[in-house]
């Protein structure tokens, strides 16, 4: 029998190898997301718009090398790029490399997660492209037109928002950043004027709605124009480039972060030459909305580092060990793609204090893993961990020691200068012809937005625009949208709806009571303005003269004499953040909860400073410790004393307390430095009673009925303000009971009301308050 031919054997081998290749291809798993990494070659030239992708990924998505595809953040519009196959042996499967120029279009930073799609159609040829510079220079004075032409020709694909960085000028002694501000094709409709029912020659609107519309540059056919614009046309609605200049009110914090991040990332050997390891961790803490996350994005954009974000809840898994594995994967990626920054948002949620009762086994394992990973980063590595929290005391103390989170940077609530800076930057983003706010108007807004954080001010600007639009639509449905402008009145109207974040947890309706609503008591009103409004509104003058403002004011007097009403009017008229505290809400049956409630009230007041804390019936909260007060009441009083005048100074917060039993308040609370000023709010005099009667009877038609209000004012001698109001209400009720359609209230109705009202203020009561005034010696 003849032997088998070798050709038959080779066919079998060939078939086997083919099947092996097919099996290998079928086993390939397409990544769910891709990681942004920098371009392997220089950013300018023929590689500007190329994206290097693993060959197997291109095969799976049926994208041919050299054809168009789109990359973009997951769930967002993409950017058109030219696909190139990376080295199969070297290029990671889940990585897409992009040039700085392409990343600038979508504000992409290294480490961003991307999705990849095949482009359905070829972009149109551009008939016109407009070029500007980030510095606002006249480009033709700095560079030759042929240099720009070659730059765009090499790029091939152009789109608004592309930034070509660090281009040498004619002189060669400096560089500029060139930006494409606009591009168009005469055969296509203007992007800003597109109608949702329109279709176009390139395959429908879906193909036009990239993040930025792409065009092909054709040398000799595409006309180049030059502009002094510093950014892409607003009609494209591109993400705004993040830079330190865009952040308002955080100059000190920015300088601190720049030194703490950039040197360890890019020059860690400087530290090792001194025999010390560079700082590895930074803890940003401060109230929500102050700009912690925004600050990180700016640092990430400017430092050109690989950024990984850990959001507490997103990595927590119900399965044992998965959370720790996710943390290890993130730190491994950071070590692989150095220099890198790991940002942990809300770190208190994944690494709480292990000493807390509510901290379980899972939290303890996560904290232990995080400690191990931070210790294992090594002295020479270029990895920095930045964490953010608004509850720094809830973070495990082992993380806050040097060697882990070496530095702690507080991002506090902005002061008036910082608010002015933030508002100026916010309104500068609007076109100058869309608002009529000058520098003085913005200063006025900044002075009135006490306790507002950056996020609140952004919301205020947005709400102001809403008010402007509503005002325009209310007057004329066909109004020209370009004639609408944001005014100071719109901003003031928006301030009613947008409250400071620190005050949002306090469900307190701002009382709409004005000084004019309080009959008489002119001396009391003047004293309250002098002692409370003036120090808060003119704090700089007080500091310059070395005068300390009163810490607190005690309003005491008989019941019904407008003590609480005065506090409400003060809150409304001053425009200052107002916190009202009711005694029964403070006391809690659980040990320590009442004291915690007091601390929380003062914390909120400090956050929203300048502010007023109003304690109504304060004698219930601070009974005399020499009397029959309980242990719980003593603990609350001690907390109150410490908060008002303890080790931590109370700045920008004034205490207003009201009581009708001043001698039952503990003496320690009444001393100077706490409730320094005592104001007696006595029964209204004849003029004050007349004012109250006029306010309460203005709809009684007393002129027709012949009721003499002066006589009624004399007859109500010794009545409290509340009793005078009750007299009017009872008289009105008597008139209605006589006739449901009554038009006027007559004297007989008042006579009937007098019979049902007894004076609540006795001579003994008045002498009691006089004795207290003599004993305290600080009545005003």
Curated annotation (Swiss-Prot):
Start-end of Low complexity biased regions: 1-23
Activity control summary: The hexamer is activated by RLP24 during pre-60S ribosomal particle maturation; RLP24 activates ATPase activity of both ATP-binding regions and increases cooperativity between AFG2 subunits. The second ATP-binding region is inhibited by diazaborine; the inhibition requires prior ATP binding specifically to the second ATP-binding region.
Source species of the chain: Saccharomyces cerevisiae (strain ATCC 204508 / S288c) (Baker's yeast)
UniProt keyword list: ATP-binding, Chaperone, Cytoplasm, Hydrolase, Nucleotide-binding, Repeat, Ribosome biogenesis
Gene: AFG2
Effect of residue 725 to E: In drg1-1; slight loss of ATPase activity. No effect on affinity for ATP or oligomerization. Resistant to diazaborine-mediated growth inhibition
PANTHER family given in the database record: AAA-FAMILY ATPASE (PTHR23077), ATPASE FAMILY GENE 2 PROTEIN HOMOLOG A (PTHR23077:SF27)
GO molecular function, one term: ATP binding
SMART domains linked: AAA (SM00382)
UniProt-recorded name of the protein: ATPase family gene 2 protein
Family to which this protein belongs: Belongs to the AAA ATPase family. AFG2 subfamily.
Signal peptide (UniProt feature, chain positions): none
E.C. code: 3.6.4.10
SUPFAM superfamilies: P-loop containing nucleoside triphosphate hydrolases (SSF52540)
Location in or out of the cell: Cytoplasm
């Amino acid at each position: 029998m003849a032997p088998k031919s070798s050709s038959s054997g080779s066919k079998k081998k060939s078939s086997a190898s083919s099947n092996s290749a097919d099996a290998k291809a079928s086993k390939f798993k397409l990544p769910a997301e891709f990681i942004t990494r920098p371009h392997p070659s220089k950013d300018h030239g023929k590689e500007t718009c190329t994206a290097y992708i693993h060959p197997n990924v291109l095969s799976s998505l049926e994208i041919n090398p050299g054809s168009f595809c789109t990359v973009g953040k997951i769930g967002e519009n993409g950017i058109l790029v030219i696909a190139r196959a990376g080295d199969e042996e070297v290029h990671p499967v889940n990585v897409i490399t992009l040039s700085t120029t392409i990343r600038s279009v979508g504000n992409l930073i290294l480490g961003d997660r991307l999705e990849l799609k095949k482009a359905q159609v070829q972009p149109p040829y551009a008939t016109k492209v407009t070029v500007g510079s980030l510095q606002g220079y006249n480009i033709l004075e700095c560079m030759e037109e042929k240099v720009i032409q070659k730059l765009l020709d090499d790029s091939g694909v152009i789109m608004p928002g592309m930034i070509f960085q660090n281009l040498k000028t004619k002189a060669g002694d400096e560089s500029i950043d060139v930006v494409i501000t606009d591009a168009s094709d005469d055969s296509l409709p203007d992007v800003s004027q597109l109608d949702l029912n329109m279709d176009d020659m390139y395959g429908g609107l879906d193909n036009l709605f990239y993040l930025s519309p792409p065009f092909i540059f054709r040398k000799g056919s595409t006309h180049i124009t030059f502009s002094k614009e510093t950014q892409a046309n607003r009609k494209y609605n591109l993400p705004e480039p993040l830079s330190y200049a865009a952040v308002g009110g955080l100059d000190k914090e920015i300088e601190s972060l720049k030194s703490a991040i950039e040197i360890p990332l890019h020059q860690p050997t400087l530290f090792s030459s001194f025999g010390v390891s560079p700082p590895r961790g930074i803890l940003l803490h401060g109230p929500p909305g102050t700009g912690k996350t925004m600050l990180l994005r700016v640092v990430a954009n400017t430092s050109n580092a690989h950024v990984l974000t850990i959001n507490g809840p997103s990595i927590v898994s119900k399965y044992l060990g998965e959370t720790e594995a996710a943390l290890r994967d993130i730190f491994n990626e950071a070590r692989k793609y150095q220099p890198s920054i790991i940002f942990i948002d809300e770190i208190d949620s994944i690494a709480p204090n292990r000493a807390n009762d509510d901290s379980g086994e899972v939290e303890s394992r996560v904290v232990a893993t995080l400690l191990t990973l931070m210790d294992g980063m090594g002295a020479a590595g270029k990895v920095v961990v930045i964490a953010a929290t608004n509850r720094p005391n809830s973070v495990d103390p082992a993380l806050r020691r040097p060697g882990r989170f070496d530095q702690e940077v507080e991002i506090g609530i902005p002061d008036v200068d910082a608010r002015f800076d933030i508002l100026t930057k916010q309104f500068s983003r609007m076109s100058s012809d869309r608002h009529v706010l000058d520098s003085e108007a913005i200063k006025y807004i900044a002075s009135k937005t006490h306790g507002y954080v950056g996020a609140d001010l952004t919301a205020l600007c947005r709400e102001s625009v809403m008010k402007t639009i509503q005002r325009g639509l209310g007057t004329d449905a066909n109004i020209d949208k370009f004639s609408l402008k944001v005014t100071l009145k719109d901003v003031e109207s928006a301030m009613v709806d947008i409250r400071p974040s620190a005050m949002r947890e306090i469900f307190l309706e701002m009382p709409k009571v004005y000084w004019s609503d309080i009959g008489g008591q002119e001396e009391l009103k003047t004293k309250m303005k002098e002692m409370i409004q003036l120090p808060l509104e003119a704090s700089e003058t007080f500091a310059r003269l070395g005068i300390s403002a009163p810490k607190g004011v005690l309003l005491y007097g008989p019941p019904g004499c407008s003590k609480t009403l005065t506090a409400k009017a003060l809150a409304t008229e001053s425009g200052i953040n107002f916190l009202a505290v009711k005694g029964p809400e403070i006391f809690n049956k659980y040990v320590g909860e009442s004291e915690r409630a007091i601390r929380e009230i003062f914390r909120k007041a400090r956050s929203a400073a300048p502010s007023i804390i109003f304690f109504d019936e304060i004698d219930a909260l601070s009974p005399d410790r020499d009397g029959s007060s309980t242990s719980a009441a003593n603990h609350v009083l001690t907390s109150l004393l410490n908060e008002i005048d303890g080790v931590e100074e109370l700045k920008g917060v004034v205490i207003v307390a009201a009581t009708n039993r001043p001698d039952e308040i503990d003496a320690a609370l009444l001393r100077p430095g706490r409730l320094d000023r005592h104001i007696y709010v006595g029964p209204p005099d004849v003029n004050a009673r007349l004012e109250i009667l006029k306010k309460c009877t203005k709809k009684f038609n007393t002129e027709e009925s012949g009721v003499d209000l002066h006589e009624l004012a004399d007859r109500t001698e010794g009545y409290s303000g509340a009793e005078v109001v009750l007299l009017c209400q009872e008289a009105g009720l008597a008139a209605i009971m006589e006739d449901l359609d009554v038009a006027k209230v007559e004297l007989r109705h008042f006579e009937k009301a007098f019979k049902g009202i007894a004076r609540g203020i006795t001579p003994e009561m008045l002498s009691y308050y006089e004795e207290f005034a003599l004993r305290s010696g600080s009545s005003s």
